[in-house]
């Protein structure tokens, strides 16, 4: 699939630059990307700001942490661009998942101050994040918790999604799976749907093995219906032939289950063929099977999956209606990329922010055009 370069951003602390390599920050990168209707939203946690840009890279708005930029360490913008800057008055640390809806509302996961963290009743799950919500013109900035506006903090937020009905879906990591919080357009909770490895359907083993291990890799909402798509990866134990002792586990299958949000019932699963690669070494050939990661679902019902390869990314798209499978490859020179983050739009466009040693490039691949040609 052909890559389309859109624009690039330099490194630094000016308004149209990204700070990815801050020396006073520890841990992983805190910069994420979202794209909706041709507009890009980049949360740059290292610089405590959110950029809103068009597809040419023109800065439309910049939302900044008031505490961070008011500390004297960072300067405010020049008078010529001051109208684009909007304050975030909450003491949150930016740098999590980000999404936008059709109204151009921005949602991003934030960490709250440690003294405001909470725990569940059993004390084994930390509630430490909220979702910052910003209206299209920046006039309204508030936050969403488990119950809605100003609610209890979430567990760790792995993904944020918005539907075509402008409803926010928050995916959180739990001790035994994932949990989906489905919010109405006004931000109040409609459904809370925990998906544990204990209630995901098991599969029968053709090897007569009773111990089957399952992980819930991701949950993606339908764009219109009250339906979640739950991707489960299944593993079987590996047994040493000589000692007859379990030596590990190996991947066997991936299934995506439609889950009715209203009654919690699982539907008939869709099989996700694994990524397969052959490696020849010392006159022997090894066949590797890897599970794809669930990237998202389009408005017309195509599920998109992705896995990293040596030469880029392998993409697999499956129609929820016809079950047709389409595979493509995205060419990326990983040796030149220091950091990347991907986004998938409801239209079927795959976007990426690719950071090398000189700049961060924003590109996309028009998978939506491929899907349109298949539907005709």
Predicted segments — roles?
Residues 1-376:
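Eukaryotic scaffold repeat domains enriched in small/polar residues
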């Amino acid at each position: 699939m052909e890559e389309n370069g859109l624009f690039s951003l330099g490194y630094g602390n000016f308004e149209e630059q990204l700070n990815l390599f801050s020396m006073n920050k520890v841990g992983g990168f805190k910069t994420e990307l979202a794209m909706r209707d041709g507009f890009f939203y980049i949360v740059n946690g290292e610089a405590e700001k959110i950029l809103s840009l068009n597809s040419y890279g023109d800065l439309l708005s910049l939302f900044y942490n008031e505490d961070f930029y008011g500390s004297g360490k960072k300067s405010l913008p020049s008078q010529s661009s001051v109208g684009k800057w909007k304050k975030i008055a909450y003491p949150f640390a930016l740098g999590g998942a980000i999404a936008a809806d059709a109204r151009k509302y921005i949602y991003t996961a934030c960490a709250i101050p440690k003294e405001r963290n909470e725990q569940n009743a059993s004390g084994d799950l930390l509630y430490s994040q909220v979702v910052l919500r910003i209206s299209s013109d920046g006039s309204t900035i508030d936050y969403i918790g488990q119950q809605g506006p100003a609610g209890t903090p979430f567990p760790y937020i792995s993904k944020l999604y918005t539907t075509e009905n402008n409803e926010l879906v928050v995916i959180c990591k739990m001790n035994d799976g994932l949990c989906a919080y489905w919010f109405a357009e006004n931000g109040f909770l409609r459904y809370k749907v925990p998906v544990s490895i204990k209630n995901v359907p098991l599969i029968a083993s053709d090897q007569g093995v009773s111990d089957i291990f399952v992980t819930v890799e991701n949950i993606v909402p339908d764009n219109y219906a009250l339906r979640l798509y739950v991707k489960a990866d299944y593993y079987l134990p590996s047994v040493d032939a000589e000692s007859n002792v379990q030596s590990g586990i190996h991947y066997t299958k991936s299934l995506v289950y439609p889950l009715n949000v209203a009654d919690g019932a699982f539907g008939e699963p869709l099989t996700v063929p694994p990524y397969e690669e052959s490696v020849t070494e010392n006159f022997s050939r090894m066949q590797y099977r890897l599970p794809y990661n669930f990237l998202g679902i389009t408005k017309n019902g195509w599920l998109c999956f992705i896995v990293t390869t040596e030469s880029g990314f392998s993409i697999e798209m499956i129609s929820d209606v016809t079950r047709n499978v389409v595979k493509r490859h995205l060419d990326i020179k990983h040796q030149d990329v220091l950091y990347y983050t991907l986004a998938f739009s409801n239209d079927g466009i795959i976007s990426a922010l690719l950071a090398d040693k000189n700049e961060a490039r924003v590109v996309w691949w028009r998978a939506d055009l491929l899907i349109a040609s298949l539907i005709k």
